[in-house]
Amino acid sequence: IEQPTFPKITEMCVKMIRRVNDEEGIKKLVNETFQKLWFTPTPHHDKEAMTRKILNITDVVAACRDTGYDWFEQLLQNLLKSEEDASYKPVKKACTQLVDNLVEHILKYEESLSDSDNKGVNSGRLVACITTLFLFSKIRPQLMVKHAMTMQPYLTTKCSTQNDFMVICNVAKILELVVPLMEHPSETFLATIEEDLMKLIIKYGMTVVQHCVSCLGAVVNKVTQNYKFVWACFNRYYGALSKLKNQHQEDPNSTILTANKPALLRSLFTVGALCRHFDFDQEDFKGNSKVNIKDKVLELLMYFTKHSDEENYFLCFPPLGFAFIQHPSLMFEQEVKTLYNSILSDKNCSVNLKIQVLKNLQTYLQEEDTRMQQADRDWKKVAKQEDLKEMGDISSGMSSSIMQLYLKQVLEAFFHTQSSVRHFALNVIALTLNQGLIHPVQCVPYLIAMGTDPEPSMRNKADQQLVEIDKKYAGFIHMKAVAGMKMSYQVQQAINTCPKDPVRGFRHDESSNALCSHLYSMIRGNRQHRRAFLISLLNLFDDTA
């Protein structure tokens, strides 16, 4: 604040802001620091201070491009929540100023992009500004409503660089959140957005398709109800897949799937993405037809998992995951259960395939969580006297049944040599536990084992889950401590890259901590638990027992 031109400010901000989820004292300090630095209204005449603030925020957002933006969302939420009931709302006012000025800066950078000398720099700045606007939209979409029409033309950006693609994806994400909040948007504006999105879906790759279909879902489902437009697109790609399937069935030895690989992959992905955001079994889409679209789509996708080369086989899984988000009941189908469980339990199966199946489960759980939170908010608005808990239990029944089906195989993925597989398995288990979909006792030994992982982020996540379980169910941890120790040894065996080296129970770093130090610290506070644990360990070495 005192030295606004100091060159290390961005670096300092990045380091501070990452502490936003630390213990209460540090969290409070971080919130106060950034409230002073960024979220205090700036006098209108002080353009220089405003520009400095914008550059500082966008520099920090750009610097965190690879590590994710959770911290920014958390910070914004903390600050806006703290003044919800206050009559004077300085943070809200500052956010409005920042959003308005970010839009001004975007228009300025766009003008200067025609100046070839600074193209790279300004293109990077443009992406950072639009990304920052998306982060604001995620927490307070109302701030962007008046700027929606300014953002729409960016959907027609000509894509030649990575930055161009990022602009399109972020603009699509902003419009997805903002357009449904607009009061009486013009027909022309909505039709233009639909046309622009459809052109992008037909022309570009997976990431663009995913974000544009998601945006189209919000615009069509919540605003225009232009179902015929989407139905035509679905039929185009569904028809292409059906045709390829029929040709392949007539002559299974033909090279038709290989020869039409690009069309096959685009059709698979687009059909999956559309099924995620639209329920084509609604009368609005298929009219009076008795055909069950979701079953037909599943049949098609499963056909290509059985008759594809390795790359095509792998690329059948993202669309399957998309279809299961809209229709979770499909995960109870016997062939889906067999397929998923065989991939998760097969030791020789490719790492990428295991990760994709775990990602599918993770995305389903995340979407389900978002859906339930939204349902909770809607109910609170409509009828405060209703029993929300009961409603949550009904809608989470399906998720609970699904996770029971795949739980064992997901937990066994903790014993994989690749850290990326363990990472996604832990994410799925954390989401499952946070939503209360399974009884936590069955996960305790596995979480103890994951607490010995060499990667700090995974260790901390597993340890945090154990702390939460211990708060709710005292005694569960010590009850499963010995089983957890045995599994810890299995995890260490799996990740031991040099089989000749013996497995050690401590970290080979400057701390030389015991791998199970977190478990010991949780048990040592209770004398009874401590003694029972030590006796159980000693009994393992008792020949007479």
Each model region followed by its residue ranges:
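Alpha-solenoid helical-repeat scaffolds
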Residues: 63-64, 68-332, 342-345
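Short secondary-structure boundary micro-motifs
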Residues: 118-119, 287-288, 395-397, 432-434
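Long alpha-helical HEAT/HEAT-like repeat alpha-solenoid scaffolds in very large eukaryotic proteins
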Residues: 1-91, 205-215, 219-279, 317, ...
